[in-house]
């Protein structure tokens, strides 16, 4: 009986507080017994694995169900959300340019990242994304190709729009069932994050990062400015309300989990659950959240811009204002295609370096620096990208609700 009440108390407890306890315990275990900390890393791997496993089917079913059950003349308001995604990504690149010029970074270059194949140009990134769009639906689900999953989900939803009410009800019930499984997995987050934190501290330590402290400060400052100044300003313009309660809730409930899972895909179920908690329109967020995980890449734009300009400063290349603005545009467009590149934002650095005539050898050494600081850079980048998906979706939903009230 006591056993059951303990489980019930855990299930009804404050998830954010439980995650905080998991973080503290993980750090403590890594300091006291690194070998034990490495072994509990399996808990983290299991948690991330479960999220990654459920995310593709969740997106596919939710998108198909929401479009199939959409009432006539009902709008999903995707256009303003996509506009905010793209504008936010460009502002992120611009912020990184300004900070990189105010506090120029020079790098001690290391040997190149072995076995990495950066794209040859922006056309290759676009080509990869287009082929992902027409991927086999089964393969898209198996390989977590969210561009393909969205395309097939939308296609099936539109086809089912004219199906019988019974068929639509089956899809609606399926989406509720998958959401229940997601809620169960998210309740296990404290254990997963405990394992992730313990193993990260035990295996990496932070000695390796000390030499790149200046670069990390510039990167993290740019991300903080976007999360705490630019995003709230964009939300205020859209809703004319105090944006900070929403921003802090999204950082707390989406950003923290994303920081430790380091995967936008794994954080899709967490974001979906948060949107449900915020009582947003399901027809809107079931499409905008997986789409955001694919194209809303403010963190990636900051990483590409900052590391490219660090390479520029290291090589002693002079950069004029127009080239810096062009870099912002290239970084923003490249970042939106980061999901179309194995290795994500780091492997798009050579593409941006090409603007300044920096050789591929030097660019790959900069990528290697990115991998060294990745434990912090990738975590912060994912936290910013993923939490911003909910911030912008909620802002547009709130704005449209205000318009509807008149």
Curated annotation (Swiss-Prot):
Keywords of this entry:
Amino-acid transport, Cell inner membrane, Cell membrane, Membrane, Symport, Transmembrane, Transmembrane helix, Transport
Q: Which Gene3D superfamilies match?
A: Sodium:dicarboxylate symporter (1.10.3860.10)
Give the stretches traversing the membrane: 15-35, 47-67, 81-101, 140-160, 191-211, 215-235, 289-309, 315-335, 362-382
Topology in the membrane?
A: Multi-pass membrane protein
GO biological process terms, semicolon-separated: serine transport; threonine transport
Where in the cell is the protein located? Cell inner membrane
Q: Name one GO cellular component term.
A: plasma membrane
Specify the domain of life of the species encoding this protein.
Bacteria
* Molecular function per GO: neutral L-amino acid:sodium symporter activity
Q: Which reaction does it catalyse?
A: L-serine(in) + Na(+)(in) = L-serine(out) + Na(+)(out); L-threonine(in) + Na(+)(in) = L-threonine(out) + Na(+)(out)
Q: Which family does it belong to?
A: Belongs to the dicarboxylate/amino acid:cation symporter (DAACS) (TC 2.A.23) family.
Q: What does this protein do?
A: Involved in the import of serine and threonine into the cell, with the concomitant import of sodium (symport system).
Q: HAMAP family of this UniProt entry? A: Ser_Thr_transp_SstT (MF_01582)
Please give the name of this protein.
Serine/threonine transporter SstT
Q: What is the lineage of its organism?
A: Bacteria, Pseudomonadati, Pseudomonadota, Gammaproteobacteria, Vibrionales
The primary gene name is sstT
